[in-house]
Amino acid sequence: MSYYNNWIELFQNHDIEAVHWSKIGEHRAKDHVIMEWARDKQYVIFTNDLDFGTLLALTQATAPSVIQMRTQNVLPEHLGHIVISILKEYDSNLMTGALIVVDDRVNRVRILPLS
């Protein structure tokens, strides 16, 4: 979890509100519980857990938006500038519902619901 604290610090340094799930809910909460909370509170899920993208596809959900890191190095020192750029560039998509996949070579944006 410590590297997530580094992400939260990076987001806050760029005036982006961020909170780790451990401050909100149970550590062992099911993914659908986290997704429901994020949808209801209009938060974007930032994760390296591929299950959130799968849940979006299976449920045809229109929210919440998910930013998914698909790379071995998930540290903000490696991806921070890319993620901050994505948050700024795709802000309107994230507000209306999107799955954004970040990796070392290319970033993909898919509008929700996924088909």
Model-derived regions, located:
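Acidic, metal-binding active-site segment of PIN/NYN-like and related structure-specific nucleases
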Residues: R39-L56
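Short, glycine/charged-enriched secondary-structure capping and boundary segments
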Residues: L10-H14, V33-M35, T59-T62, I82, ...
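Mid-chain, well-packed structural core segment of small domains
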Residues: G53-L87
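Charged phosphate-binding loop/patch that engages nucleotide di/tri-phosphates or the phosphate backbone
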Residues: E89-S115
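Conserved beta-strand termini and adjacent loop/short-helix elements that scaffold enzyme active sites
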Residues: W21-I24, M69, V102-D104
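N-terminal first-folded block
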Residues: M1-V44
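Residues at secondary-structure transition points
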Residues: G25-V33, L50, V74-H78
